[in-house]
Curated annotation (Swiss-Prot):
Pfam families: Ribosomal_L9_C (PF03948), Ribosomal_L9_N (PF01281). The gene is rplI. One of its GO terms (biological process) is translation. This is Large ribosomal subunit protein bL9. GO terms for molecular function: rRNA binding; structural constituent of ribosome. Belongs to the bacterial ribosomal protein bL9 family. Binds to the 23S rRNA. InterPro entries: Ribosomal_bL9, Ribosomal_bL9/RNase_H1_N, Ribosomal_bL9_bac/chp, Ribosomal_bL9_C, Ribosomal_bL9_C_sf, Ribosomal_bL9_N, Ribosomal_bL9_N_sf. It comes from the Bacteria. One of its GO terms (cellular component) is ribonucleoprotein complex. It comes from Salinispora arenicola (strain CNS-205). Keywords: Ribonucleoprotein, Ribosomal protein, RNA-binding, rRNA-binding.
Amino acid sequence: MKIILTQEVSGLGAPGDIVEVKNGYGRNYLLPQGFAIAWTKGAEKQVTLIKRARSAREIRDLGHANEVKGQLEGLKVTLKARAGDGGRLFGSVTAAEIVAAVKAAGGPTLDRRRLELPSHIKSIGSYPVRIKLHPEVTAAFDLSVVQG
């Protein structure tokens, strides 16, 4: 079955990629979850739109990715969140909040979907955060969550 990915699926591809998958995987998982659409001639226009949007926010080349990695590695990112007396947060820290904290700390603008968090951040402390800037470049920085 030929499908067009609308979201990044690990081990399969990026948005806009046309891939061949087994019928059951496509019909029972990818299509109902919204990860893909069925391939048709009319869907070619949608593929073009997805690829255009991806290229607009993608880091262009390896050199630029390494430059952004250098900016992130030396960055001290602190995020203030509401917490109770025991240090447990009211809710959890989202990827969008982390991206905003990086921007506020003087870092580059990042895509929240490329963040790789070790687990849900639900308490005050220091956490390692990784971000995949390019297929060959991954940057890491420490996020400090403080009561605020």
